[in-house]
C-alpha cells in the first residue's frame, strides 16, 4: 500500500507519539508490530521534522522527540490534529461548495448538485451533496435555513478574518494557555498567523494527545450525562463531575462518580470515551465532590475518607530568605504558614492522604527542623528516603563517575520492515460518540485543506501560479513529505482546483473563499471571553462587542469544570486596572518594536528603573504569572538580560522604535545538562519522564540497560530544577554535572544533620503525632 502521512484515526499515532516523546528509550525490536512501527515513525518524522532524534541503544537505535516547550511559539504536537485523511470528493466538494454558497442565497442539496455540474462540470449525486452539507452543518460551517419542506443551506456568517486584531492576539496567547489550543491553532493557520509575542513555561505539550477524551468528559459534564470509557482492555462507566490537572506532575484526571464513591481516571490511560445516558442526580454528585475538594492534596481519594494532619517547621535566615515563606503560601495549597521571630516557619495542612504530600515536603530538604503528622507510615518513609539519599550522595564524586555523555543525534538510518500486526482498535460500541470530540479531528481543518486554500488565495491575489511557486509554498506550509504526496493530484488534475494555463502556469478554477469558523471554534472563543485574563487584551467595550458577536454560543467549557489542584495561590492581579495598563503598554512595545522605560521592584526588594529592549512575554501555567524577558538598553551600562515579573512593574512608558536586528531573541543561557538515573520503584520512571517533560529532555539507555535522562535547562531555572529533583528523593539519582550533584549533596547532608534521623517507631499502619 502506498505510504500516506495522513491517517483515518488517531489511536495508533497517539500511542506512538506518547512513546517517542516520553519513553524515548525503546527500539524497533521492542514493539510487537515492526511494520506499524515503521509507518508511524515515518509519519511522525514527517509531521515534526527536526524534533525527532535517534540515539544508539542496546539492540538498535531508539527514536525520541526532543521539544523545548519554553521556546516554542505554539505546541508542535497540534500537527497531529491536522492529519485526517480524505478522498478526492471530500476536498473537491469542500472548495466547490464554499465558492457556490458564497455567491448567492441559500441552496437545497439538489440545487447545489445541479449548480456544481453546470458551473464546473463536476457531477455529484444529490445524495452525496446532501450528506456533505449535513456534515458541514454539524460542524457549523454552514447553517440550515428553514424553507418549508426543503432544507436549504448557507455559509455560517463568522470567519476568522472578521475577528479584531486585539482578539487575535488573545487567541495567540490562549492557544497555549487554555484547554483545546488546537482550535486556536486552526484560527492561526487560517490567517497565516505566527505567535511572535508570547512564550510559555511549565507547559506540558503532551496533554493535547488526550484532548478528545477530555472534551467528551466536559461535554458529558455540561449535559449532566454519564460516560463510557475504554481503559486498556476494560470498560468503565460513571458520571464525570470535574477534570483535575496537575501542573507540576503533568497528569490530568477525570473525576467519575461510580457506585457510591468517586474515582479518578488518568486521561492518558483512556483509549476511547463515549457519552452515556443522562444522570438525574448529576448536580448532587458535583456538589458532593466540590465539598471534598478542599480536603484533597492531589489526585488521591482514599476510602473511607479521613483527615491527616501534617506539621513542618523550617529554618531560614529570616528576612534574607523571605522567599521561603512566600513559596509556602504560593504552593502550600491552602496550608497555614506562620513566620516566627527567630526565622523559623511553621507550615500546617490537613489532607485526606498525607502520603501524597511527600514530594512537596522533600523539596524543602536541607531546611526541615521537624516533621510531625498523624500518618506514621508517611513519616517513616520520609526518614527512610532521607537515609537512602544520604547513602546515594555520601561520597564526593559519587555521581559524576557514572555519568554518560549526552546522547548525540545519529544519522537517519534506513529502517527495514520486519514483523507486522495491527494495533488493537480502541473504539467501543457502548455509548454514543461525542460529536464535539469527533469535530476536533476532521479533514476540513487539516493541513492539506489549508495549503489548497492558501494557494487559491495567492492565485486570486497574484494571478496564475508557476509549478515552482506551488512547490515552494507546499514545502513551506506542509509537512516533510507533503510535497511528494500533494503536488501530483494538484498538478495532474486529480483534484481539479486549478487548470493549465499558457506555458506551465496554473489558473484557479474557483474563487478563494474564507472558511467560516466552526461551532467548536466559536464555542472555544466564547469560553475565552469568560476568562478574566481576556481583560488584558480587550477594553470593556471591545469585550462587549466580541460577546455580542458570539451571542447564543455556548462556551466550550466552564471554569467550574476544571481544577488545577497545584496551581499557585498567588497569581498576577489580572483584574487590576494598573496591572492591565502595564500589560497593554508592554504588549504594544513588543508589537511595535519600541523601547520600554520601566520602574519596578526587584525580587530582593530593590527599586530598579531604566530603558529595556523587550523580547518576549513569558507566561507560567503553574504560577499563573507573566514575566517580561528583556535586555537593558541604557547608554553606558552593560546590556544584561533581565527577567521582570510584570506584577512588580509600577510604571511603564513607551520609547522609540528599535531595529529589527536588535529585537532578535538571544538563545537562552544553557548550562551543562543534568543527568538523572531513573528507577522503576514506585513508578518513578514514568512519573519522572512526565514530570520533567516541560524541559527539553533526551533519554538514553546506558550500556548495561540503565535508563538515563539528560535535562537541558536555562541557568535561571537551576533552583527550580533542583527543587523538582529533590521531590523524587532517592527514586532518581543525579549523576552529573558534579556541581549539581554537590548542590543535592549539601541539601541532603544538612537535612540529615537537622533531623538526626529521628524516625518514628511502630508498625507500618500505626498513627499518632511524632
Question: At which residue positions do the language-model features occur?
Answer:
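Short alpha-helical segments that sit at the start of domains
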Residues: 1-9, 72-98, 429-451
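Well-ordered mid-protein domain cores that form the structural environment of catalytic cofactors
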Residues: 70-130
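Short amphipathic alpha-helical interaction segments
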Residues: 32-43, 122-135, 483-486
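Bulky hydrophobic/aromatic content
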Residues: 13-21, 48, 94-96, 100, ...
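Polybasic (Lys/Arg-rich)
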Residues: 18-22, 26, 190-192, 276-278, ...
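Core beta-strand-centered patch of the WYL/Sm-like small regulatory domain
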Residues: 30-37, 192-310, 408-428, 556-675, ...
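Eukaryotic partner-binding/assembly regions in large regulatory complexes
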Residues: 1-61
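Short helix-coil junctions and helix-kink-helix linkers
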Residues: 24-34, 114-124, 472-479
Amino acid at each position: 500500500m502506498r505510504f500516506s502521512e495522513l491517517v483515518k484515526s488517531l489511536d495508533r499515532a497517539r500511542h506512538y507519539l506518547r512513546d517517542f516523546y516520553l519513553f524515548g528509550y525503546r527500539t524497533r525490536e521492542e514493539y510487537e508490530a515492526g511494520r506499524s512501527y515503521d509507518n508511524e515513525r515515518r509519519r511522525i518524522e514527517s509531521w515534526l521534522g527536526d524534533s525527532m532524534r535517534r540515539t544508539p541503544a542496546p539492540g538498535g537505535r531508539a527514536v525520541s522527540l526532543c521539544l523545548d516547550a519554553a521556546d516554542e511559539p505554539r505546541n508542535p504536537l497540534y500537527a497531529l490534529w491536522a492529519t485526517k485523511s480524505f478522498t478526492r470528493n471530500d476536498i473537491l466538494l469542500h472548495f466547490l461548495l464554499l465558492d457556490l454558497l458564497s455567491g448567492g442565497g441559500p441552496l437545497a442539496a439538489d440545487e447545489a448538485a445541479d449548480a456544481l455540474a453546470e458551473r464546473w462540470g463536476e457531477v455529484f449525486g444529490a445524495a452525496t451533496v446532501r450528506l456533505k452539507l449535513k456534515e458541514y452543518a454539524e460542524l457549523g460551517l454552514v447553517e440550515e435555513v428553514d424553507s418549508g419542506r426543503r432544507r436549504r443551506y448557507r455559509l455560517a456568517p463568522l470567519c476568522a478574518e472578521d475577528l479584531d486584531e486585539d482578539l487575535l492576539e488573545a487567541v495567540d496567547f490562549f492557544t497555549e494557555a487554555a484547554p483545546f489550543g488546537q482550535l486556536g491553532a486552526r484560527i492561526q493557520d487560517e490567517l497565516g498567523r505566527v505567535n511572535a509575542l508570547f512564550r510559555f513555561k511549565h507547559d506540558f505539550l503532551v496533554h493535547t494527545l488526550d484532548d478528545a477524551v477530555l472534551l467528551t468528559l466536559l461535554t458529558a459534564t455540561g449535559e449532566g450525562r454519564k460516560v463510557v470509557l475504554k481503559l486498556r482492555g476494560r470498560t468503565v462507566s460513571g458520571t464525570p463531575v470535574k477534570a483535575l490537572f496537575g501542573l507540576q506532575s503533568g497528569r490530568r484526571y477525570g473525576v467519575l462518580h461510580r457506585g457510591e464513591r468517586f474515582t479518578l481516571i488518568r486521561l492518558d490511560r483512556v483509549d476511547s470515551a463515549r457519552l452515556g445516558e443522562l444522570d438525574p442526580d448529576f448536580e448532587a454528585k458535583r456538589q458532593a465532590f466540590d465539598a471534598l475538594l478542599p480536603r484533597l492534596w492531589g489526585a488521591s481519594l482514599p476510602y473511607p475518607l479521613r483527615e491527616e494532619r501534617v506539621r513542618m517547621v523550617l529554618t531560614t535566615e529570616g528576612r534574607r530568605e523571605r522567599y521561603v515563606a512566600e513559596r509556602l503560601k504560593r504552593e502550600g495549597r491552602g496550608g497555614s504558614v506562620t513566620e516566627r521571630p527567630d526565622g523559623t516557619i511553621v507550615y500546617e495542612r490537613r489532607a485526606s492522604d498525607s502520603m501524597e504530600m511527600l514530594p512537596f515536603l522533600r523539596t524543602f530538604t536541607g531546611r526541615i527542623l521537624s516533621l510531625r503528622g498523624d500518618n506514621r507510615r508517611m513519616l517513616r518513609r520520609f526518614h527512610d528516603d532521607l537515609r537512602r539519599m544520604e547513602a546515594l550522595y555520601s561520597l564526593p564524586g559519587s555521581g559524576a563517575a557514572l555519568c554518560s555523555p549526552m546522547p548525540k543525534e545519529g544519522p537517519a538510518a534506513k529502517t527495514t520492515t520486519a514483523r507486522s500486526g495491527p494495533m488493537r482498535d480502541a473504539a467501543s460500541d457502548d455509548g454514543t460518540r461525542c460529536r464535539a470530540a469527533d469535530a476536533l479531528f476532521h479533514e476540513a481543518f487539516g493541513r492539506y485543506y489549508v495549503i489548497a486554500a492558501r494557494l487559491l488565495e495567492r492565485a486570486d491575489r497574484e494571478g496564475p501560479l508557476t509549478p515552482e511557486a506551488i512547490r515552494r509554498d507546499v514545502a513551506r506550509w506542509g509537512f516533510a513529505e507533503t510535497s511528494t504526496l500533494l503536488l501530483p493530484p494538484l498538478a495532474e488534475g486529480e483534484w481539479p482546483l486549478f487548470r493549465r494555463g499558457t506555458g506551465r502556469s496554473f489558473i484557479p478554477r474557483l474563487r478563494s473563499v474564507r472558511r467560516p469558523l466552526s461551532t467548536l471554534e466559536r464555542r472555544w472563543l466564547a469560553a475565552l471571553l469568560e476568562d478574566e485574563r481576556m481583560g488584558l487584551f480587550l477594553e470593556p467595550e471591545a469585550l462587549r462587542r466580541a460577546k455580542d458577536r458570539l451571542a447564543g454560543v455556548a462556551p466550550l467549557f466552564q471554569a467550574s469544570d476544571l481544577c488545577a489542584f497545584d496551581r499557585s495561590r498567588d497569581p498576577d492581579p489580572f483584574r487590576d486596572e494598573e496591572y492591565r495598563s502595564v500589560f497593554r503598554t508592554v504588549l504594544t512595545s513588543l508589537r511595535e518594536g519600541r523601547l520600554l522605560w520601566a520602574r519596578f521592584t526587584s525580587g530582593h526588594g530593590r527599586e530598579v528603573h531604566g530603558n529595556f529592549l523587550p523580547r518576549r512575554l513569558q507566561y507560567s501555567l503553574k504560577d499563573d504569572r507573566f514575566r517580561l524577558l528583556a535586555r537593558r538598553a541604557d547608554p553606558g551600562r552593560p546590556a544584561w538580560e533581565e527577567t521582570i515579573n510584570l506584577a512588580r512593574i509600577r510604571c511603564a512608558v513607551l520609547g522609540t522604535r528599535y531595529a529589527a536586528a536588535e529585537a532578535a531573541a538571544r538563545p537562552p543561557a544553557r548550562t551543562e545538562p543534568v543527568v538523572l538515573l531513573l528507577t522503576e520503584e514506585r513508578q518513578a520512571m514514568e512519573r519522572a519522564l512526565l514530570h520533567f517533560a516541560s524541559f527539553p529532555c533526551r533519554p538514553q539507555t546506558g550500556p548495561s540497560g540503565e535508563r538515563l535522562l539528560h535535562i537541558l535547562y536555562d541557568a535561571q531555572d537551576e533552583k527550580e530544577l533542583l527543587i523538582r529533583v529533590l521531590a523524587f528523593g532517592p527514586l532518581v539519582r543525579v549523576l552529573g554535572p558534579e556541581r549539581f550533584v554537590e548542590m543535592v549533596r549539601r541539601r541532603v547532608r544538612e537535612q540529615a544533620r537537622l533531623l538526626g534521623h529521628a524516625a518514628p517507631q511502630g508498625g507500618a499502619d500505626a498513627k499518632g503525632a511524632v
